UniProtKB/Swiss-Prot annotation:
Gene for this chain: EDS1
SMART domains attached to this UniProt entry: GAL4 (SM00066)
Family per similarity comment: Belongs to the EDS1/RGT1 family.
UniProt-recorded name of the protein: Transcriptional regulatory protein EDS1
UniProt subcellular location: Nucleus
Nucleus recorded as keyword: yes
Length: 919
């Protein structure tokens, strides 16, 4: 019998089961209320900010107003200075800690507004049940969120590109992306490998076509990826935290092709769970455009017979081209049919399908011809002829050869984009209307990527060229000469980029010379070239209705490589890799005498400047080959009596008006000054015994030094007026409005051609500094380094001579005139110092000042002795003067100091000019 407790308050007691049900219902209500609060908090976090309190990190650090643009995802301040607009810093406010949902929303908001971490939004499109198009890009990610992978804190000094890796998955459709015309540089970000211990199941091997990595994932793999998110997040963050150390020491290139996959790369690509790929911001945007185009154009999703072909190429990397055969009993008929079907289904590379990308590339090509070609023709052919070479629609080209052609053209596009994007000047003022960042946000992001991954892009592009080389050599007889010309032009462009940037390593120059020698390019200059077949030459091919002499074009490329080798030897003091004597090759192969079809530049003024710069490279080649350091065992009397013959490089009338002629004259006078200063040390006692001899020697040295200072001042002034930063300034030259016009018979003219077209009939076709405003020259860095070294060494000579003349009194007639000339030289030295401060970016690549001097060989004054003097120490020791008067003791010290300057000038000539010197 149960006893009930009396109810003292007169309220009925409910059943305990009913109480339990009520408590459960209250819990559901509380849970729904809390969920609504969380949703409200997350909506509040993702809401666009309206106040200046949510400024980005850069604007907060500079204490300026942050004008954020929701369309571009970048504030106005960061866009003008070219910095990364990011919201990493979490504002510390008073009060209780924020909820977890708001913090996540802030991170998500910061990642969405990050221009380098740009991810286009995915939408759902109406799709037919029978067609399987590309799924959304958001489902291709194998991690929980992109914002959770942002590990390092990026500073303005060293910004690393935030790479978004994706799973390597099997492509199932969209032939439009296979025919993409986007640059191969979008694949450079794919050189990213996750940890092998992740054991991520891969749905197939990756397929890289035309430089675009296409991640497509099956619908059923999404759920499995969600289950693996927790186990993958930690190792992914650890891998992303390690930056690239040296891309030249990296392993194999990520570039793999269906047509020339090497055995090592093939075995690596066939292993499941080993490779991972990622997309750059530009490739993500390109894929989204391809999706939209494929959906609107209605491309059918057809499965082509690519499995048999890919297996065949995977097993045999050095494939043979298969010709079409009309015999139905031929065993390769079915494979040919499938290849032909796929080739017909692919969109054209430069056709109307990718009109935007084609226009963008021709814009880059136009920038090259306007700003680079006029000083050094890396592409030794005029713009109209080279544009015809890029057209993939050429007759008698089979499918396999067409695929190789497309890969080579993509490599060239990548190299040219790296050259242009890395040299474009970013304006820091809002007045600029042609800044690259204002032209297109996508181009701005691509430029930042190329700058931050400069060495990696160069290394990957050159590695892809090396991968193509065996196939190109084996099928040289069927591959068109125009494609081989583009292939070797790409090698020249890559070396040009490194030398222009001041790189001090020859890791790319040596293999490049080896590739040219492997194709026997040097035999083009030999008289018995017709006795054996040439790998580079086929029969002359028609370009339109005209015939191009590709032998002349390949000779030009080899001469350009020789000049690039000369510049490296001139700067670094290393031996030349090409020692072939070309004779007067510039006038023979680059002038308009070769014919109108293969002329380097049609504008007479631009062609004149090109020939001048190339002749300067030819003179520096002769200058380098006649170094005294290569004749260490020569007797000491021949060291000073032998005079280098520069008769064939005599300066013509009017050559001093241009920078190339001034620099050539400066090098000649430098050699004369070295010989005079070293002769002083040899006959020191004879000079001191006769005052007349001493006065004559001082007069000659003073005049020579003053003329050299005047030349240096003119060279630096011309460089400052032309382009002080040696970068592309889009405001200095207007670009044409249209870069790409299909089926247009009218030729597009560059600004240089349009300006100078009326001057063709005039007698004076000389190129002036005004015509070179804003152009980029590869000779500027060696010029500035050489001028800096010369001024650092000969700068004290005018002051020393003035003090000598004043102390000795009227030793000869015309002392006052000499002192006035030396005083004028001192004023020019002050102007030169100001010009060097303007040209400070050129000196950032300088070596350590004391690199070329032996540390142990120091004098009592702390000055380092010359390397060349140490080499010839036993051969050219100065004899001691006997019975020297006390008044001549100071003169002896001065002459000895001049001799030391001569030795250090010889160091500059013999050991390279890329470092500075102490007096």
């Amino acid at each position: 019998m149960s006893h009930h407790v009396p109810n003292l308050y007169g309220t009925p007691i409910r059943d305990p089961h009913e109480r339990k049900r009520n408590s459960a219902s209250m819990g559901e209500v509380n849970q729904s209320v809390s969920s609504r609060n969380c949703e409200r908090g997350s909506e509040k976090g993702t809401k666009q900010r309206k106040k200046a309190s949510h400024a980005c990190d850069q604007c907060r650090r500079k204490r300026i107003k942050c004008r954020f643009d929701k369309h571009t995802g970048v504030c106005q301040g960061c866009l003008e200075v070219g910095e990364k607009c990011q919201f990493i810093r979490v504002p510390l406010k008073r009060g209780p800690a924020k909820k977890r949902g708001s913090v996540v929303s802030i991170e998500k908001f910061s990642s969405d507004n990050d221009p380098l971490q740009y991810r286009p939004r995915t939408h759902s499109y109406p799709m037919n049940s029978g067609n399987n198009y590309l799924p959304s890009l958001a489902r291709n990610s194998s991690f929980p969120s992109i914002s959770s992978l942002f590990v390092p804190s990026i500073t303005a000094q060293s910004q690393q590109f935030v790479k978004v890796p994706y799973d390597d998955i099997k492509r199932r459709s969209s032939l439009a992306i296979l025919g993409s015309d986007s640059s191969i540089s979008t694949e450079f970000g794919g050189n990213y490998r996750l940890d092998e211990n992740l054991n991520v199941r891969q749905e197939g091997k990756d397929i890289v076509a035309k430089g675009m990595i296409t991640p497509v994932e099956e619908m059923g793999a999404c759920s499995s990826n969600v289950r693996r998110q927790g186990s993958q997040s930690l190792p992914i963050q650890e891998q992303r935290a390690s930056p690239y150390i040296n891309p030249f020491i990296s392993g194999r290139s990520r570039l793999s092709s269906l047509s020339y996959t090497s055995e090592a790369t093939t075995s690596e690509g066939n292993t499941q769970g080993k490779n991972q790929c990622m997309l750059t911001p530009n490739s993500v945007r390109s894929i989204e455009k391809e999706r939209l185009n494929s959906l609107t154009a209605g491309f059918p999703n057809k499965k082509l017979g690519t499995d048999g072909r890919s297996d065949k190429w995977d097993k045999n990397s050095t494939w043979k081209p298969v010709y079409r055969s009309s015999n139905p009993s031929h065993p390769s008929t079915e494979k040919n049919v499938s290849l032909n079907q796929e080739a017909s289904a692919k969109p054209l590379m430069l056709g109307t399908y990718r009109q935007f990308d084609a226009t963008s590339f021709y814009k880059v090509l136009g920038i090259y011809y306007n700003f680079f070609h006029i000083n050094f023709p890396v592409i030794p052919i005029n713009k109209s002829k080279f544009t015809d070479m890029l057209d993939p629609e050429k007759p008698n080209v089979i499918d396999e050869i067409r695929q190789i052609n497309n890969e080579i053209i993509q490599c060239f596009k990548t190299a040219l984009e790296v050259l242009v994007f890395c040299k474009i000047k970013q304006r820091r003022s809002s007045k600029s209307t042609k800044s690259w960042s204002r032209d297109s946000l996508c181009d701005f992001q691509k430029g930042l990527y190329y700058i931050q991954n400069f060495n990696k892009c160069i290394a990957d592009c050159f590695q892809s060229l090396i991968t193509i080389k065996p196939v190109l050599k084996q099928n040289s007889s069927v591959i068109p000469s125009r494609i081989k010309f583009i292939y070797f032009s790409t090698i020249i462009v890559l070396n040009f980029i490194l030398i222009l940037a001041g790189e001090e390593s020859s890791l790319l120059l040596g293999p490049s010379v080896g590739v040219f020698n492997e194709f026997q390019a040097h035999k083009l200059f030999l008289p018995f070239q017709n006795t054996s077949p040439m790998l580079l030459l086929n029969s002359n091919e028609e370009s339109g209705d005209e015939i191009l002499d590709y032998a002349v074009l390949f000779k030009r490329l080899y001469i350009l490589l020789n000049i690039l080798d000369t510049l490296q030897s001139f700067r670094l003091g290393q031996p030349k890799l090409i020692n072939l004597n070309f004779g007067s090759a510039i006038e023979t192969y680059f002038s308009d005498k070769t014919g109108h079809n293969q002329v380097v530049e049609k504008a007479p003024v631009a062609l004149d400047n090109i020939l001048r710069n190339l002749k300067l490279g030819e003179f520096i080649t002769y200058f380098v080959l006649n170094r005294k350091s290569l004749q260490v065992n020569v007797p000491h009397h021949l060291l000073f009596t032998n005079q280098t013959d520069y008769g064939e490089f005599a300066v013509e009338k009017g050559e001093h008006d241009n920078i190339a002629g001034k620099f050539e004259t400066l090098l000649k006078k430098k050699e004369i000054l070295i010989r005079k200063l070293l002769n002083i040390e040899q006959k020191n006692d004879h000079i001191l015994e006769n005052c007349c001899n001493s006065d004559a020697e001082m007069k000659n040295i003073g005049e020579l030094v003053c003329s050299m200072i005047t030349l240096v001042s003119g060279i630096l002034d011309s460089i400052t007026n032309m382009n002080a930063e040696n970068s592309v300034d889009l405001d200095s030259k207007p670009l044409p409005n249209a870069y790409f016009a299909q089926d247009s018979e009218e030729e597009l003219m560059s600004p240089t051609q349009s300006i100078t077209s009326n001057l063709a009939s005039e007698e004076n076709t000389r190129c002036t500094t005004k015509d070179l405003m804003g152009t980029v020259s590869i000779f500027m860095l060696p010029m500035v380094e050489e001028c800096y070294n010369i001024i650092s060494l000969i700068g004290p000579i005018p002051t020393t001579l003035i003090s000598l003349y004043i102390r000795n009194g009227n030793m000869a007639k015309g002392i006052n005139d000499r002192i006035m000339t030396l005083s004028t030289a001192l004023n020019e030295l002050v102007q030169i110092t100001a010009l060097f401060n303007t040209l400070e970016p050129f000196r950032k690549n300088a070596h350590d000042r004391a690199k070329r001097y032996y540390v142990s060989a120091t004098s009592s004054t702390g000055c380092y002795e010359s390397v060349m003097k140490s080499m010839y120490s036993g051969k050219c020791a100065a004899s001691n003067a006997s019975n020297v008067a006390p008044s001549e003791e100071e003169n002896k010290k001065i002459l000895k100091k001049f001799a030391d300057i001569g030795w250090k000038l010889m160091d500059d000539s013999e050991l390279g000019c890329c470092c500075c010197f102490f007096n």
